[in-house]
């Protein structure tokens, strides 16, 4: 686009070409728009510059999220996998884990720890990750396994199943906060990894969206508890339903609030203290 062309374009056309299509704008064209007597044209320029700043900041953020992956890529590794789980704290439903290997040039705009995203953003990113990943997998540990093993080790089982489900064998695994036992390849545990590694963040999004969809299905099979809304987490609505209806087959009977609803003594105690102790042992 030449500077002399700008004056012949309406403000609506400028918006379409520069904002909707993202056509490049050279220095001379920027200067021409800055001097354009039309306030609307100058506003288009302001928005172009704002988007440029945001894109630059997003690029820096994504590079920061890829620092663990970049170090491994520089060593010649290709299949760097990330894995994370969702659903450790709920009173009902399985633990679900996601795993993925991403292409080196993949930069999904807006990716973050799944807990920091709204549902629409998570679902958009999950579909984008599935389309672009070298490979991905979702797996779970069922309620019966949670009750038999305790939730920490059931979570480890779900993580391992997700990793084993990848069609490409990982050369290195990035894990959120813990180490998986007996893996045949190296791994790096990263505390708060879903906020510090792009690949773990992608895995967390796969896990969270898969579990949310499953809990919506289970809500139809077990009406009255509100599983589609609270996803099995210990909310006031969920406690009220437990009091009225008692426990259903997908409730974790080793969790204290469920056992109380059934008139049983607590069994697992402080599961997250147990999990922290196990992580400390791994370290």
UniProtKB/Swiss-Prot annotation:
Cofactors, names only: Mn(2+); Mg(2+)
Chain residues that bind a divalent metal cation: 84-85, 176
Major localization listed first in the record, in broad terms: cytoplasm
Keywords: Cytoplasm, Endonuclease, Hydrolase, Manganese, Metal-binding, Nuclease
E.C. numbers: 3.1.26.4
Gene3D superfamilies assigned to the protein according to its UniProt record, in alphabetical order: Ribonuclease H-like superfamily/Ribonuclease H
Keyword Oxidoreductase: no
Cofactor binding comment, as recorded: Manganese or magnesium. Binds 1 divalent metal ion per monomer in the absence of substrate. May bind a second metal ion after substrate binding.
Function: Endonuclease that specifically degrades the RNA of RNA-DNA hybrids.
Name this polypeptide is given: Ribonuclease HII
Organism expressing this protein natively: Anaeromyxobacter dehalogenans (strain 2CP-C)
Gene behind the chain: rnhB
């Amino acid at each position: 686009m030449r500077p002399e062309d700008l004056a012949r374009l309406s403000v609506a056309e400028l918006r379409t070409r520069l904002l909707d299509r993202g056509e490049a704008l050279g220095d001379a064209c920027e200067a021409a728009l800055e001097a354009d007597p039309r306030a609307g044209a100058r506003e288009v320029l302001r928005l172009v510059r704002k988007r440029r700043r945001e894109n630059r900041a997003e690029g820096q953020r994504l590079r920061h999220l890829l620092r663990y992956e970049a170090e491994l890529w520089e060593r010649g590794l290709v299949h760097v996998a990330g894995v994370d789980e969702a659903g450790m704290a709920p009173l009902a439903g399985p633990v679900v884990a996601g795993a993925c290997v991403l292409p080196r040039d993949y930069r999904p705009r807006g990716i973050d720890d799944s807990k920091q995203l709204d549902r629409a953003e998570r679902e958009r990113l999950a579909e984008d990750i599935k389309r672009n990943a070298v490979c991905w997998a979702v797996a779970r540990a069922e309620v019966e396994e949670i009750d038999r093993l305790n939730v920490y080790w059931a979570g480890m089982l779900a993580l391992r199943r997700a990793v084993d489900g990848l069609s490409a064998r990982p050369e290195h695994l990035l894990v959120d906060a813990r180490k998986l036992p007996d893996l045949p390849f190296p791994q790096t545990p990263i505390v708060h990894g879903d906020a510090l590694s792009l690949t773990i963040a992608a895995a967390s999004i796969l896990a969270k969206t898969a579990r949310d969809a499953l809990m919506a299905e289970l809500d139809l099979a077990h009406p009255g508890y509100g599983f589609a809304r609270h996803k099995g987490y210990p909310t006031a609505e969920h406690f009220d339903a437990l009091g009225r209806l008692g426990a259903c087959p997908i409730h974790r009977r080793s969790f204290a609030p469920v056992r109380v609803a059934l008139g049983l003594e607590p069994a697992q105690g402080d599961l997250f203290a147990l999990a922290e102790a196990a992580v400390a042992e791994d370290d």
